[in-house]
Amino acid sequence: MNQNVVIIGTQWGDEGKGKIVDWLTERCQAVVRFQGGHNAGHTLVIGARKTILHLIPSGILRADVSCFIGNGVVLDPLALFSELDELRPVVPDAQERLFISDACPLILPYHKSLDRAREQAMGAAKIGTTGRGIGPAYEDKVRRRALRVADLFHRERFAAKLAEALDYHNFVLQHYFKREPENFHAILEQYLELADGLAPMVVDVSVRLARLQAEGARILFEGAQGTLLDVDHGTYPFVTSSNTVAGGASAGSGVGPADLGYVLGITKAYTTRVGAGPFPTELFDETGVFLAERGAEVGATTGRARRCGWFDAVALRAACRVNGVTGLCITKLDVLDGLAEIRVAVGYRVNGVVQEELPGGAEALAACEPIYESFPGWSESTAGVRHWADLPQAARCYLEAIAERAERPLAIISTGPDRDDTILRTEIL
């Protein structure tokens, strides 16, 4: 069995990764977030209780599991403490089991102001950002202008770096976007006060994870967003600002690639997307409405309605390739219950020419017309089914067809939001 597993979304995010992380964590000792920030939205349902996590790893709901926020994550301390406060009635020891890399870049107030100002200025061409400062924080990291968690514990160093960064960003806010500048002293005092609360959680995540591995612990790497939102491999420029693919797990945690283990690709039984960007299989008819309503397709972070469409096997195959996916997990199968016909995009037609590979970039994808293969639906309910043999024959055929198109084995099927509404086809851990 594999010692570690990487959980990756293979679509545009919202694939149901949080539930699967929570379910698999029963067999793990640590969970690691390695990219993104509090723009993620992982919804977990346990019994009658629903918990939505944005920054803290989903393994926090399992007792005795250590949770890590790796160096690849951009950290908003205010959002972190807010989430911890919300968790406290349910997970009173969350702060004691959470560890944060000292190398995490900080999201500061000017990042949020810039994010919102930039999005508003783009008008109809806007990307659909969450407005939480994620993109500007990553820009500062690449520009080597970022303030990191470690800087919080050195007042003079933090103040000097803040002054330099703020001088630049306030100029942009005032003279380009015509916005009010951010206040240096207010930011300095507010964030230095947060340092005491952060201090017990700050560690060298790479070293801690290496020690856990040496002790035989199983580590789960929790991806946020999805492959098609990857800054390099996604539908650029309608992407997030980090590497959401499996390779990001190594760079964003300090664990070597050879130690990542099994790569589990999570995909919905249909396709959704939040925000702008091309979406070849998007539905604008009553079936699209059916999927949105039955699937409760509203973003956990933004509250925006998700766009819905048929399953795209071309995109899945590309995601499996760039992630090195070992096995597939298909979620929300129960949403398709009752449809007479289900379609899967198996290729694209571009200017009359058939192609079977996902094109790079948004412009090329926008020109693609999907070529569909049809499958019979099923009238029986799959909600809550926990054994493969209990699924309708048509549902099994549909799932097997997806796996065949992806050239990957079926590992897990999710048939509902509860952690136990799950079918295991292949042992992972």
Swiss-Prot record:
SUPFAM superfamilies: P-loop containing nucleoside triphosphate hydrolases (SSF52540). Coiled coil: none annotated. Its main location: cytoplasm. GO terms for molecular function: adenylosuccinate synthase activity; GTP binding; magnesium ion binding. CDD domains: AdSS. IMP binds at residues 14-17, 39-42, 130, 144, 225, 240, 304. Keywords: Cytoplasm, GTP-binding, Ligase, Magnesium, Metal-binding, Nucleotide-binding, Purine biosynthesis. HAMAP family: Adenylosucc_synth. Belongs to the adenylosuccinate synthetase family. Plays an important role in the de novo pathway of purine nucleotide biosynthesis. Catalyzes the first committed step in the biosynthesis of AMP from IMP. Homodimer. This is Adenylosuccinate synthetase. It comes from Acidithiobacillus ferrooxidans.
